Amino acid sequence: MAVVTMKQLLDSGAHFGHQTRRWNPKMKRFIFTDRNGIYIIDLQQTLTYIDKAYEFVKETVAHGGTVLFVGTKKQAQESIAEEATRVGMPYVNQRWLGGMLTNFSTVHKRLQRLKELEAMEQTGGFEGRTKKEILMLTREKNKLERSLGGIRDMQKVPSAVWVVDTNKEHIAVGEARKLGIPVIAILDTNCDPDVVDYPIPGNDDAIRSAALLTKVIASAVAEGLQARAGQGSGEKPAEGAEPLAEWEQELLAGATAGAADASAEGAAAPESSTDAS
């Protein structure tokens, strides 16, 4: 069965690019035509590239890898958090903090601080402190939760990064490339395909398009988790694959049950990316 259908892509508005005056010439090969001053993306190519990205993500996770989901624009925040959480992967859907990948040792210390503050709050560690001290500690915890909550369980840099809008997330993309971490991303008509290892030509501004493609990537993760656990067709886990952690085993049932949801997207009015900045 196809990972996603042409109809689903059309219904989500994935074929609408930016206005013809706002484009990156490097994207020419992915453009089918232009209509009323708006580029139309070649969805036949999109389907092909989706299959390549899906297979890469599935194999990466099957061999013990993790995928970091990144999308801080308003249209992507909800689906990024929802889909990453569904399959137990880290995500960033608020502001990207410089050095999240290239200076991960420092970021990891901040994560430890977040867990320390949460433990203090839950075990009565705030007792005996002044109201001002409690307020300051609570504010610190909330700030860390907002900026780092999505990567709280990330113990090392990810094996790959999924990005919605490479232009907006250029710092994240740059850090990934600097470390040699493969980038999978939606490529709108104003993006640079040279900075992405596994591109998926499509509309990165429409909520439904971003959600559909993010769900596809999450479903690939779910299938990879299933393969890692040695389930699916009953085969043994791939050689060299890491065993599932306990928390991953708990997530597996729910994650794999939702893996087919990407093919159940309902029809919706298409959204173009012309109104987005």
Curated annotation (Swiss-Prot):
InterPro entries: Ribosomal_uS2, Ribosomal_uS2_bac/mit/plastid, Ribosomal_uS2_CS, Ribosomal_uS2_flav_dom_sf. Residues 227-277 are annotated as: Disordered. CDD domains: RPS2. Keywords: Ribonucleoprotein, Ribosomal protein. GO terms for cellular component: cytosolic small ribosomal subunit. Residues 253-269 have a biased composition (Low complexity). It comes from the Bacteria. One of its GO terms (biological process) is translation. It holds the Pfam family Ribosomal_S2. The keyword Cytoplasm does not apply. Belongs to the universal ribosomal protein uS2 family. PANTHER family: 30S RIBOSOMAL PROTEIN S2 PROKARYOTIC AND ORGANELLAR, SMALL RIBOSOMAL SUBUNIT PROTEIN US2M. This is Small ribosomal subunit protein uS2.
